[in-house]
Each structure stands twice: as C-alpha cells, then as structure tokens.
Amino acid sequence: MLQLIEQEEVEDVFDLNEKFLSLALGVEVDDLSLLPKIELRVDSQLHNLQVTGEILRSLEVLKLNDSVIRCFRDIGTSFKNVRVLHMARCEIRELQGIQAFEQLEELYISFNEIDDLFDISFCEHLTVLDLEGNSV
C-alpha cells in the first residue's frame, strides 16, 4: 500500500513525481534515473508523464498496459531512450506524437481504438508492431 505524501514534502510537480514513483516502484529517489524497465498504470489526465520521462532517464522498456492514455502527445517528449513500449488497452485513438520515441524498436498497442497508421512511418527503428484488436 502506498504511503501518503505530506504537502510540506512537495516543492513542485517534478518533486511530487519523484516521490510518487519512488513509493510506487519501491526504490530510492536517487535510483529512479537508473531504472532500465518499469511497469505502471496511469491516467494521463491526472499524471504528468512528461515529468516522469525526465525522471526515468535510463528507461528502455516502458509498460503502460491498461492505462488511460488517449494519444501519444499525452505522454510528452521525454522518453527518448525507450526501445520497447507496451500500451495495450489504453484507449489510444491516434498515433500523433509517436515520433517522440526516437529509439523505438518494438511497439505493442493491441486492443486500442487506432484506425490510422500514418505516424508510424516516422519511427525509423521500429521492427515489431502489434496492432491486434484495432480498427486498421
């Protein structure tokens, strides 16, 4: 069970995200930037994923299955080193912003609401694409 974070402990959004991730993942704040792989369930309307990417700078594998993320723009542009991305059942409607994942090699986006693949053409390194259960 997660501990509550006291308001006095939080200085800004970056600090709040660090504390939340540290508690949720069970690691020290100083070790967050070293994590190569994580699995989270988030609602991009409530959680600032741009800041999360700035904190998790070494991240190469990101699993966000069963999250609420309707488009890649909601994730931001800070996950530059992610090579493998899992986003099954996330209510994704469009792929605009996918090019922010500059190193993306594997994309698992099954059972979403995707009906257009145009933006996938910007993913130069992509070798694996799972679209099962989409409208394409």
Regions found by a protein language model. Name each.
Residues 93, 111, 115-119, 124-136:
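Leucine-rich repeat domain C-terminal region
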Residues 52-54, 75-78, 97-100, 110, ...:
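Low-complexity, polar/charged sequence tracts that form flexible coils or short amphipathic helices
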Residues 12, 102-107, 133-136:
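Phosphate-binding glycine-rich loops and adjacent basic patches that engage nucleotide phosphates
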Residues 1-88, 93, 106:
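The feature captures the LRR N-terminal capping module
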